[in-house]
Amino acid sequence: MRAKIISVVANNFYVHLYDLKIQIKAIPKGIFKHNSHELKPMVGDDVEVELIGNTYLITKIYERYNQLIRPKVANIDIVLIVVSIVQPDLNTLSLNKYLAFYEARNIKNVLIGLSKYDLANNHLKQKINKLILDYKKNNYAVFILTKENDILLLKEKIKSKTLCLAGNSGVGKSTLINKLDPSIQQRTQEISHFLNRGKHTTTSTKLISFANGFLVDTPGFGNLEVNLTKNEMANAFNDFANYARFCKFSNCLHIEEPECAIKKAVDEKLIVNWRYDDYLKIIKELPNDVLKIKTRAQNRKCK
């Protein structure tokens, strides 16, 4: 039977059986416990489960199409980065760090959700609308979370997918979750009871049934902190991709190198200035070729 690992609690694995639409406890086959085995079961894995006697056994792990180490989760279909326009103010540098990280980790659908748009004044809304157009030109889907039509479009986008919500506290993630699936509160209580833990004691990653798919529930997405190399960062801005291959040097970091196609594209207004400026700020943070992203840092704000 095909299943998905939804939680690991004290070396106990809980899986969702696709066909039966139930959740059961399962034990990994002994081979997965050996240090020599490449794959170790983790939350998000699609697995094969067999009932042997009275025990469900995980006998196979299907190939992952992506995975994160911190938080530890595999096979993410969509990441929705939620940022507020006011209270707190929109921070494009923080947002671009999120975007770069998930692009670098092979997550194909990274979406942007803007909350509290209705609280912005007209002057700020004009700037935000220009910002939205710039992101859309770079093939990012942007949703204004206070607009009912955008919520409907987002519901359709996430249907039957494994979704992660990223973003700092206070930006409206909880409100959004209830808008996307009003039954989530009851289901969260059911899952907490199944896993025998309180709803306020989440210390590890788990998946909750959500919008005919799954929602990643983890403490690790609120304050992203990861390591990226300079070369990874240089390749993580998707608006650079069409131009970077024309750089003179294959390892060009697009800072001061001669014959850099990215700098030329910025001069020709093919890449927007503020995105490139944010890129320079990000990559110049890199000591010894490593970037430690801290999304709570004080960075550029759109006012």
Curated annotation (Swiss-Prot):
**Co-factor remark:** Binds 1 zinc ion per subunit.
Can you list the GO cellular component terms from the UniProt entry? cytoplasm
User: Where does this one sit in the cell?
Assistant: Cytoplasm
Q: Name one GO biological process term.
A: ribosomal small subunit biogenesis
Q: Kindly list the GO molecular function terms attached to this UniProt entry.
A: GTP binding; GTPase activity; metal ion binding; rRNA binding
One Pfam family here: RsgA_GTPase
Where's it mainly located? cytoplasm
Q: Tell me the superkingdom of the source.
A: Bacteria
EC assignment = 3.6.1.-
The residues the record assigns to binding Zn(2+) are C247, C252, H254, C260
- Which purpose does this protein serve, as stated in its record? One of several proteins that assist in the late maturation steps of the functional core of the 30S ribosomal subunit. Helps release RbfA from mature subunits. May play a role in the assembly of ribosomal proteins into the subunit. Circularly permuted GTPase that catalyzes slow GTP hydrolysis, GTPase activity is stimulated by the 30S ribosomal subunit.
What is the name of this protein?
Small ribosomal subunit biogenesis GTPase RsgA
- Native source organism of the sequence: Ureaplasma parvum serovar 3 (strain ATCC 27815 / 27 / NCTC 11736)
